[in-house]
């Protein structure tokens, strides 16, 4: 059984999208990769619409079993975080409309899964994604490589077997702590 994962490195300026097929033996093959760009001159609603339309097209064309999205962190500046969060929301909603499970992975989880180090730089991630997927050339820009890395991370962390399509199966301790904290915060409201 092959698992198809659509990975998304969300962003308003550049949104990386990659589709990977992963076999039970963890062998991965790139199906497609690209970047959706939006102009800063467009209004926010128009930028999100461009991303939404592209994501809809990718989901319908590639029919993934699961969507893996980079989890937003507040370490960045506020305007960057907002843009990433808004783009993430568009992606998550598009998948939800189709009944496709969504999993969120932190940048550190992705780096660790692909390179073995949670502090690896973008060049190391790109180099290993290129090697793992047996590509002739590195995916460019880095957002494209990051999207493929997200897809690989989800498949490997969730296990490419039966429960892999579920966004909540096989959570890491950090993901479990995060999910528990979010659930606790929701109960307090």
Curated annotation (Swiss-Prot):
The keyword Secreted does not apply. InterPro entries: RNaseH-like_sf (IPR012337), RNaseH_sf (IPR036397), X-over_junc_endoDNase_Mg_BS (IPR020563), X-over_junc_endoDNase_RuvC (IPR002176). GO terms for molecular function: crossover junction DNA endonuclease activity; DNA binding; magnesium ion binding. Its main location: cytoplasm. Pfam families: RuvC. GO terms for biological process: DNA recombination; DNA repair. Binds 2 Mg(2+) ion per subunit. The active site is at 9, 70, 143. GO terms for cellular component: cytoplasm; Holliday junction resolvase complex. Its cofactor is Mg(2+). Coiled coil: none annotated. Mg(2+) 2 binds at residue 70. The keyword Hydrolase applies. Transmembrane segments: none annotated. Mg(2+) 1 binds at residues 9, 143. Homodimer which binds Holliday junction (HJ) DNA. The HJ becomes 2-fold symmetrical on binding to RuvC with unstacked arms; it has a different conformation from HJ DNA in complex with RuvA. In the full resolvosome a probable DNA-RuvA(4)-RuvB(12)-RuvC(2) complex forms which resolves the HJ. Belongs to the RuvC family. This is Crossover junction endodeoxyribonuclease RuvC. It comes from Paenarthrobacter aurescens (strain TC1). The lineage of its organism: Bacteria, Bacillati, Actinomycetota, Actinomycetes, Micrococcales. The gene is ruvC.
């Amino acid at each position: 059984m092959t698992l198809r994962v659509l990975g998304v490195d969300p962003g308003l300026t550049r949104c990386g999208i990659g589709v990977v097929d992963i076999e039970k033996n963890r062998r991965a093959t790139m199906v497609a990769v690209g970047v959706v760009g939006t102009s800063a001159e467009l209004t926010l609603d128009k930028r999100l619409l461009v991303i939404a339309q592209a994501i809809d097209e990718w989901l319908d064309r590639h029919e993934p079993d699961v969507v893996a999205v980079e989890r937003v962190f507040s370490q960045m500046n506020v305007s960057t975080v907002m843009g990433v969060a808004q783009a993430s929301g568009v992606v998550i909603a598009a998948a939800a409309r189709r009944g496709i499970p969504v999993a969120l992975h932190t940048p550190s989880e992705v780096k660790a899964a692909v390179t073995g180090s949670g502090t690896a730089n973008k060049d190391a991630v790109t180099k290993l994604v290129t090697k793992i997927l047996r590509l002739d050339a590195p995916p460019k820009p880095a957002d494209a490589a990051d999207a493929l890395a997200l897809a690989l991370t989800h498949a490997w962390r969730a296990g490419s077997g039966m429960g892999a399509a579920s966004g909540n199966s096989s959570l890491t301790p950090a993901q479990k702590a995060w999910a528990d904290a979010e659930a606790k915060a929701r109960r307090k409201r």
